[in-house]
Swiss-Prot record:
Official protein name in the record: Ribosome-recycling factor
Origin organism lineage: Bacteria, Pseudomonadati, Pseudomonadota, Alphaproteobacteria, Hyphomicrobiales
Function: Responsible for the release of ribosomes from messenger RNA at the termination of protein biosynthesis. May increase the efficiency of translation by recycling ribosomes from one round of translation to another.
Family named by the database record: Belongs to the RRF family.
HAMAP family from the UniProt entry: RRF
GO biological process, one term: cytoplasmic translational termination
SUPFAM superfamilies for this protein: Ribosome recycling factor, RRF
SS bond list: none
Main location group: cytoplasm
Location in or out of the cell: Cytoplasm
Gene Ontology MF terms: ribosomal large subunit binding
Length: 187
C-alpha cells in the first residue's frame, strides 16, 4: 500500500502554516479601526533593555477608533510615550497620568487602496508558499512511484488529495483576503 515516507497530514500542516502567516500579516495592516495588535511592533526602552509594549503596559480598545495604554510603572510613562511616537505608526498619544490614549485617524481613499494592494501582495505570497508545498508533495509522490514504493494508482490518488488540499487552502486564503479588503474599504 502507501509508504510511510509520504504524509499528506504533514503537507496540510505546512500549507496551513502559510495561512497562519497570512493571518498574522493581515492583522498587522492598520485599517482605521483600533486593534491592540497594532502596537505589537512597539519596543520600549525599559529597565536597561528593549521590551515589547505589552510587557510594561495593558493595551485595551475602549472604542472602535481609540486605544488605551495603561502603563504599570509611573516612571515608564515617558518612555512608553516616546516609543509610540518613534514607532512610525502615525499615532500621537494623549497622556493622562499613567494612561495614554491613542486616537486612530481615519484612512483616506488613497491609503486604503495602498493597503488593499499590500494585502493582495501578502495573499499572493501565501498562495506561492502553498504551491511550493504542493510541488514538493507531488515531486515526492513521483519519486516514490518511480522507485516502486507506491503504485501508479496510489500516486494518482494521493496527487489528487494533494490538489484538493491545495485548492482548499487557496480558497481559505481568498476568503481571508476578501474579508480584509472589505474591512479596509469600509469607511
Amino acid at each position: 500500500m502507501v509508504s510511510g515516507s509520504f504524509d499528506i497530514g504533514d503537507l496540510k500542516r505546512r500549507m496551513q502554516g502559510a495561512t497562519q502567516s497570512l493571518k498574522h500579516e493581515l492583522g498587522g495592516l492598520r485599517t482605521g479601526r483600533a486593534s491592540s495588535s497594532m502596537l505589537d511592533p512597539v519596543q520600549v526602552d525599559a529597565y536597561g533593555s528593549h521590551m515589547p509594549l505589552n510587557q510594561v503596559a495593558t493595551i485595551s480598545v475602549p472604542e472602535p477608533r481609540l486605544l488605551s495604554v495603561q502603563v504599570w510603572d509611573k516612571s515608564m510613562v515617558k518612555a512608553v510615550e516616546k516609543a509610540i511616537v518613534d514607532s512610525n505608526l502615525g499615532l500621537s498619544p494623549a497622556t493622562e497620568g499613567q494612561v495614554l490614549r491613542l486616537r486612530i485617524p481615519e484612512l483616506n481613499e488613497e491609503r486604503r487602496k495602498e493597503l488593499v494592494k499590500v494585502a493582495h501582495k501578502y495573499a499572493e505570497a501565501a498562495k506561492v508558499a502553498v504551491r511550493h508545498v504542493r510541488r514538493d508533495g507531488l515531486d515526492t509522490l513521483k519519486k516514490l512511484e518511480k522507485n516502486h514504493e507506491i503504485s501508479e494508482d496510489d500516486e494518482k490518488r494521493l496527487a489528487n488529495d494533494v490538489q484538493k488540499a491545495t485548492d482548499s487552502v487557496i480558497s481559505e486564503i481568498d476568503q481571508l483576503l476578501a474579508g480584509k479588503e472589505k474591512e479596509i474599504l469600509t469607511v
